[in-house]
Amino acid sequence: MNTPPPAAAGSEVIWLYEKQQTIHARSVSGWFTHWRWALVWLTQVVFYGLPWLSWNGRQAVLFDLASRRFSLGGLVLYPQDFIYLTGLLIVCAYGLFLVTAVAGRIWCGYACPQTVYTEMFMWIERRLEGDRMARIRLDAAPWGAAKALRRGGKHALWLALALWTGFTFVGYFTPIKTLWAEAFTLDFGPWEWFWVLFYGLATYGNAGFLREQVCKYMCPYARFQSAMFDKDTMIVSYDAERGEMRGQNARRGRSGQAKPADLGDCIDCDLCVQVCPTGIDIRKGLQYECIGCAACIDVCDGVMDKMQYPRGLIRYDTQNGLAQHLSRWQRWRRVARPRVLIYSAVLLMICGALAASLWFRTPFKVDVVRDRGALARLVDDGRVENVYRLQLMNSSEAAQRFRIAVSGLDGLQAIVAADVAVGPAESRWVPVAVQLPALQAQNLGSGAYPIEFAVERLATPDDDTVWRSTERSTFLLPR
């Protein structure tokens, strides 16, 4: 009942669920490979090094979830600043749309974490097990001391790199110097243990085993990228008009003879397939598995040099460029097309709005929380008192003094210190008792009445600007 019907003559059966086959990608060198490794170094120096930098005595980049404070150098954000995170995510999304419309999956091929860590893991693999053919022979060889030593060493280094990656990731959310001190005694908290192991093992599994499966099946970007492509998108392309018909070296002669007239420049060496990290044949045309890494371009250019043919049989080009034989200048002129211009305009507007909002935002935030222990109570002389807790969040790099006042009802009075000091990039909870005289309370009767807290940042010798922020709440009168 589960047996598929026989295929018609001349047709091909495509299985929806294909068994994973190990891809042993061949090493390659060239212009694009050098750029890819440059970006590997750049991204990893930033990722591993950023948490260790200090800014005014604190960790420069720290997403302190426990304190609900995010530090990005001199920029301190609180949960009330969630709009900025939303804006940043929108900027990243439109940036990805723009890059994809112009140059295809170039992000995937050069800077995606999956690609970056797979490259690092494959480098370790090549150092210990050899290049493609050596690894294939090692896979087929029976288990012995040499094989166990090579495989064990590889996995040990993979795990070390993966756990260090997990440790660094947690260091963005817990002070990394504290985390480093705890590492020597293995005195991590339960959540720290969980995330170091989870992120580390996820890196180990994704970069060591799943590899191209993540790009082909797990990553949603591979599926919806075609919605952002058009015929003027720069992609890795095979020039079939120049390359076909393919032929082996034997038909071309090896003693300076000219190649047969019926053969194209492609010598059918399959090196472009062997170096591809996703195992595809770029000569079949645009495929969703292609991540745009250009490994096939580098290896093909090397073959063309040896054959004394012009480079560019496989190259970055557009579908229109191949079909219409466009020059490089003509191809780049088509970059400024409506899709790209719209993405660019929206991206610039969002970046401008985000930058302006950050520039003009107040240097502090206020949050009002009612004391849940006692909603309202009677105190001396029949006055009615409500108790609140105000969180004063200083997002500047200098200590600030604040003055708190309350309004909204006649006779309302805030019982709080005249000035409240908050350190640089810190927050402080301040208890505030708000009292209403008995006469006004009797005239109003029971119920909830709107009031407003006004928090004023006092001028300092370095900054005479007076900032003011207001927050609304309610004052409860009991029956």
Language-model region placement:
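Asparagine-centered strand-capping/turn motif at beta-strand->loop junctions
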Residues: 392-396
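Cysteine-centered iron-sulfur cluster-binding motifs in ferredoxin-type domains/subunits
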Residues: 100-115, 207-222, 257-304
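Short acidic, flexible loop segments centered on an aromatic residue
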Residues: 397-411
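Hydrophobic alpha-helical transmembrane segments in integral membrane proteins
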Residues: 352-376
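Intrinsically disordered, low-complexity Pro/Gly/Ser/Thr-rich segments with frequent PxxP/GP/PP motifs
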Residues: 414-441
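Membrane-embedded alpha-helical bundles of multi-pass integral membrane proteins
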Residues: 1-246, 297, 310-347
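Terminal connector regions
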Residues: 437-479
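Solvent-exposed, conformationally flexible loop/turn segments
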Residues: 381-385, 424-427
